[in-house]
From Swiss-Prot:
Function: Component of the general transcription and DNA repair factor IIH (TFIIH) core complex, which is involved in general and transcription-coupled nucleotide excision repair (NER) of damaged DNA and, when complexed to TFIIK, in RNA transcription by RNA polymerase II. In NER, TFIIH acts by opening DNA around the lesion to allow the excision of the damaged oligonucleotide and its replacement by a new DNA fragment. In transcription, TFIIH has an essential role in transcription initiation.
Gene symbol of the encoding locus: TFB2
The protein's name: General transcription and DNA repair factor IIH subunit TFB2
UniProt organism field: Kluyveromyces lactis (strain ATCC 8585 / CBS 2359 / DSM 70799 / NBRC 1267 / NRRL Y-1140 / WM37) (Yeast)
Self-association and partners: Component of the 7-subunit TFIIH core complex composed of XPB/SSL2, XPD/RAD3, SSL1, TFB1, TFB2, TFB4 and TFB5, which is active in NER. The core complex associates with the 3-subunit CTD-kinase module TFIIK composed of CCL1, KIN28 and TFB3 to form the 10-subunit holoenzyme (holo-TFIIH) active in transcription.
Location of this chain's protein in the cell: Nucleus
Length: 496
């Protein structure tokens, strides 16, 4: 999932809130800043243009500011701002005149001008004599977040997340109950693993919001706290005494997700982790918590930078992300030492060897069928392979496409990163599975006459338990649930 798509998902939730709830949200300057960051560039421009205007603004004026080929973006931005209740009808009540929501306008002005913000951005604990290092915060948040991901993919010998986290995973449809009460990953869960860390966090937090509403928790308090976390400063301690009862309850849950850290000896303060600061960040999305944290730490440790090193760093980041090469013979090489990435691969790849910085395996009919039977689709497997393809595979695909375009500029082929034979075979394995559906039931044969066969088969069809029949061979198949009814019917009418 791209960063834009995750923003759209958050906006969809916010747009669906009642106007009264939206207005209460805008009383918090930190929330106003976070929502502003989630808007499209054009909507941001309109907000800034109207922020210091004391009179109504005409929609015709906004239309004049936009190029003719950007009318769709204009309509989308206006619709989004209206749905969020950021713009309302002008004071003059004349058509086509609008103004900023006065509550949002006041709070957002305070953000930009340093006005009254009422601890909206947290209350810093000045008496923090033993601060927690950023390295400790980074390690803590990565362990907590990736514990959740490891549990989802079934990595052996890993810790189990807290009970509330498991409830959330099940409630959100990312995992479902299997045999013996254990949880297993679902189709949606595998799609969740394909997302970047920002989208993963917001996916769970939006489900947390829905669960919070059913638990009678104030959604405004919940949202304000989440948006506040995204605006706090890494490495600073913040007091808990200004938090509402709802937000105090959230502290334990946010600890389980790795968004905040608290010393066991001092629960009066909390520290936001780097994952929390990414919640409303406009920086690029990362594929995992480890990659996000390692990227920041690597930049902090750099003392010199040359052009050659830059390319090496980029390759290293991709390698940490599990860059892989797949051949036409279905052999796969993944340059990763991450247990999480290896566990995800094991869901649909038959792994053979593991080295210090690489694992090898092969896509087989059985390994892919096992993934398909567990709810993972062929398109999701293909998407994962494309997303994590090695830069050299992408470069080779681009070169091949360029050569085809040179020979025939009208060619309509798209960039094929993966070997076509591999992509086609994965889809064929799914089609093969879709053609075969198994049912438990009973086969009826050896009827004395065609009339006897037809009468019993028609009865089975009428009561909806007939699954298959062959008139030439005078046989049919009924479900387990309907077998007793068909037997009783046969005894009443044909047994002497």
């Amino acid at each position: 999932m791209s960063l834009n798509l995750f923003k759209t998902t958050v906006n969809d939730y916010l747009e669906g809130l009642p106007e009264q709830v939206q207005s209460r949200l805008y009383e918090s300057p930190a929330t106003c800043l976070a929502i502003y960051r989630l808007l499209s560039p054009m909507a941001k421009f309109f907000i800034m243009s109207m922020l210091f205007q004391d009179h109504d603004v005409s929609l015709r004026d906004l239309d004049k500011w936009v190029k003719p080929d950007a009318k769709y973006q204009l309509q989308y931005s206006i619709k989004s701002m209206k749905s969020l209740n950021l713009i309302i009808e002008g004071e003059s009540k004349q058509p086509l005149l609008i103004r900023l929501n006065p509550i949002f306008k006041k709070s957002f002005k305070n953000v930009l001008t340093g006005g009254e913000i009422n601890n909206s951005f947290g209350d810093v604990a000045d008496d923090d004599t033993n601060p927690v290092s950023t390295a400790t915060l980074d390690q803590y948040s990565a362990e907590k977040w990736e514990t959740i991901l490891h549990y989802m993919v079934g990595t052996p010998n890993t810790n189990t997340p807290g009970g509330k986290v498991l409830d959330l995973l099940q409630h959100s449809g990312l995992m479902e109950e299997a045999e013996y009460g254990e949880l297993k990953i679902t189709n949606q869960g595998f799609q969740f693993l394909l997302q970047d860390v920002n989208a993963q966090m917001w996916t769970l937090l939006l489900q947390y919001l829905k669960m919070a509403e059913s638990l009678q928790m104030d959604p405004v308090d919940v949202l304000n706290f989440i948006f506040m976390l995204g605006a706090l400063q890494l490495g600073k301690a913040y007091k808990c005494d200004q938090l509402s009862n709802t937000q105090r309850t959230m502290l334990q849950d946010m600890r389980d997700y790795g968004l905040i850290y608290q010393n066991q000896s001092d629960y009066a303060k909390f520290y936001p982790t780097r994952l929390a600061t990414l919640l409303t960040s406009d920086t690029k999305a990362f594929r995992s918590a480890s990659v996000a944290l390692d990227s920041v730490l690597n930049k902090a440790n750099e003392t010199t930078a040359v052009e050659g090193d830059s390319g090496q760093d980029e390759t290293t980041e991709r390698t940490q992300d599990g860059a892989l090469i797949i051949e036409t013979n279905f052999k796969l090489y993944s340059y990763s030492n991450s247990p999480l990435q290896i566990a995800i691969l094991s869901l649909f790849v038959h792994l053979k060897s593991r080295f210090a910085n690489m694992v090898t395996g092969q896509l087989t009919r059985e390994s892919v069928r096992n993934a398909l039977l567990n709810g993972i689709t062929a398109e999701q497997i293909i998407a994962y392979l494309e997303t994590h393809a090695h830069p050299r595979m992408r470069r080779l695909a681009e070169e091949n496409l360029s050569k085809k375009l040179e020979l025939d500029p009208t060619v309509k082929e798209t960039l094929q990163v993966l070997p076509p034979t591999v992509v086609d075979q994965i889809r064929l394995w799914q089609l093969e599975l879709d053609r075969i559906i198994s049912y438990d039931g009973y086969l009826y044969t050896d009827f004395e006459s065609y009339q006897e066969y037809q009468t019993v088969a028609d009865y089975a069809k009428d009561i909806g338990v007939l699954l298959w029949q062959n008139e030439k061979k005078k046989m049919f198949f009924v479900s387990t649930e309907g077998n007793s009814q068909v037997l009783d019917f046969h005894r009443r009418n044909f047994d002497k």
